[in-house]
Each structure stands twice: as C-alpha cells, then as structure tokens.
Design a protein with these regions (language model features):
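Flavin-dependent oxidoreductase catalytic cores
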Residues: 1-368
C-alpha cells in the first residue's frame, strides 16, 4: 500500500513533492558576534532538502526578541546575507524553505538585553528555564527573571518588527515565513490568560487575547502575501505556566480567524501521545481551518500514515529524526534503518552532530 506521506501537495502556491516536513529546530550555531547564519548552516539545511518543506529554525525578529544564546536573527544586513547562503544552498538542491520568525518575550534573560528586563504581556515570570551559553559556548539552563509588562504603545512596534522580519526573509530568498505563536513565546503569552493579565485591548477576553496574533498576521500577510505565511500554534502545551483553561478553544478560534485570512498553512505541535484529546483537537482544528495543516509531535512512519489517512492533517513534521537523518524521506520510503540522534550535540558546538550524520547510501557504500 502506498503511503500518503509520499504524495505531492502544495503550500500556498508552492508545490511540494511529499508531505514530510522538517520543522523548526533550534540548534544554536549562529556565528558570533551578530548571530549570523553561516556556510555550515547552509550545508546542514541543504543536506535535508529532500523534505517536502523545510521550516528553518526560530529566528529573532529584532535584537529585543532574543531569548537564547547563539540563535540567529533576520534583522541585520549580515544576517540577511547569511540566510541567503542557506536559501541558495537549499534551492540548488531542489528544496523549499520557509523561515520561522519569533519573539521570545518573557522566555529570556537580562544578559541578552544589556541588563534590561525581557518584555511580556504582563509581569508574570516564566516558570521554566532557558538555554544560555557561557564564555566558551558551554551552554546551561538558567532561570528567567520576572519580565516587564509591555506598554500598549510598544506593541505596535513589535508588530512592525514581525512585518520587517518577514520582508527581510523574502529578501534573503526564503519561500515564506512561519509566525511562531506556540510553545510559550511572546505571541503565545498573549493568547493565554495565565501569562496575559492585561486590562487593555490586548487582554481579558478571548477576542482581546487573539488581537496581537491577528495584528502580526495581518502585518506579515500584508507585506509578503498570505500564500507565503504560515502560523504555528500549540493548543495542548500546558507546561511552564501555560496551562490556560481555554487554550484549546482559543486555538480553534485562532485557526478560524487565520483561515479567514487565507494563510498558507497551520502548524501545530502535540505532546507526542495518541490520547482521545489529541484526536479531538485535530478534528476541531480541521473543522476551523480547511487549508493545509502540519502536525508535529514524535511521529513515526506508522503514526504519520494513520493521521494523514484520517484527513485531520495534510503534512507531518519529524524533528529529531531529521536531525540525525539528512535523507529522512528516502529512509522512510524504503524502510531503511535510521541513525540515532545524539542529544549532547543538539545545542551549540561545531560540525559534530550537525552536518556529519551519514546518509543511508553513504553508509551502505563504505568500502570494506
């Protein structure tokens, strides 16, 4: 039986040869100073160009957006030039690549902001930790401070930063952008009543909590077109103080509003289970959003086939498997064995654990 994973589809106006997505994966290997993408990053993404779609790692829309060490930006001329190396390399291999753009909000540290507090919808601290590198890029997890609540007038500036980042991404050669509204970062912080305790037009009711996401979406689609704009949500993310009692209906309402705007796709990530809630949420999102839906969350080939056959989603993203298997689509299609990822090399470092994972053909053709 033919797997639906290998059927062609499209995202906006972009034809895709298969339904296998490489999702955004923070790898913390941008060059310093300046958080600039490099030729090594270009090699990494080009190795994985057989994905139906690559969504490049979460990228800062501004210097103020930063929340982790060694992550790239798309707000300086050097960064745009660095990303052009990446997109050119992927396109030469016949691939397709979007860029995920983000603002970390409260998931940040004063060291990234010259001693100033990170900003957020409200002065509510993030309950978890973020990764911060030391003097020699030796990383470690550190607690986040209580953020400063954004003034109402400042929010428009961040919307403008998202718009400019999208324009910069297109200048750098990306086929589109993904707005990161998931996983507890700034837009998600606005969506949740646990992190958003504002009393102005951006807080309180669900309508108000959706406002920032929709303003960002309108700004980005107005700049580069809806067909080149995707959005990521995480309705079932309840970790680190994000357990909002209406997170699922808020995400479903967001999906409906995004559908009205004609965005290219909706991307959701799941906790990686097969619970009844997972199916219910996928069905609700499908009812609200008729366009392409990408799902991520620890999927195997078998689970991916099943969820595609259900009609609840259209494409499946594979994160850790793509880290270790640059030729993942071929391995999945032919049933070839998979390389095992090396977690110690996920964040920071050099080529080891980044561009040195072998392809299956390379493995099989090693001389005796």
């Amino acid at each position: 039986m033919t797997s639906p994973l290998f059927e062609p589809t499209h995202i906006g106006d972009l034809p895709l040869p298969n339904r296998i997505v490489m999702p955004p994966l923070t790898r913390a290997r941008a060059a310093q100073p300046g958080n600039v993408p490099t030729a090594m990053n270009a090699a990494y993404y080009a190795q994985r160009a057989s994905a139906g779609l690559i969504i490049a790692e979460a990228t800062d829309i501004s210097a103020d957006a930063k929340g982790y060490s060694l992550t790239p930006g798309v707000h300086s001329a050097a960064q745009i030039a660095g990303w052009k190396l990446v997109t050119d390399a992927v396109h030469r291999q016949g691939g397709r690549i979007f860029l995920q753009i983000w603002h970390c909000g409260r998931m940040s540290h004063v060291d990234f902001h010259d001693g100033a507090l990170p900003v957020a919808p409200s002065a509510v601290a993030f309950a978890g930790q973020i990764w911060k590198a030391g003097q020699y890029a030796q990383g470690g997890m550190v607690a986040c401070p209580t953020p400063r609540a954004l003034e109402t007038a400042e929010i428009a500036d961040i919307v403008a930063d998202f718009r400019q980042a999208a324009l910069n991404a297109i200048e750098a050669g990306f086929d589109g952008v993904e707005i990161h509204a998931a996983n507890g970062y700034l837009i998600d912080q606005f969506l949740r009543s646990t992190s958003n305790q504002r009393s102005d037009q951006y807080g309180g009711s669900r309508e108000n909590r959706l406002r920032f996401l929709l303003e960002v979406t309108d700004a980005v689609t107005g700049a580069i077109g809806a067909a080149r704009t995707g959005v990521r949500l995480s309705p079932r993310n309840r970790a680190n103080g994000m357990d909002c009692p209406d997170s699922i209906p808020t995400a479903v309402e967001a999906a409906a509003r995004l559908a009205e705007r004609g965005v290219a796709y909706l991307h959701t990530n799941e906790p990686g289970d097969d619970s009844p809630e997972a199916t219910e949420v996928r069905q609700q999102l499908r009812a609200a959003f008729p366009g392409p839906i990408i799902v991520a969350g620890g999927y195997t080939r078998e689970r991916a086939d099943a969820v595609l056959a259900s009609g609840e989603v259209d494409l499946v993203a594979f994160g850790k498997l793509f880290i270790a298997n640059p030729d993942l689509p071929a391995r999945l299609q032919h049933g070839w064995p998979l390389n095992t990822p090396e977690p110690a090399t996920f964040f920071g470092g050099d080529a080891r654990g980044y561009i040195d994972y072998p392809t299956h053909i390379t493995t099989e053709e090693q001389p005796a």
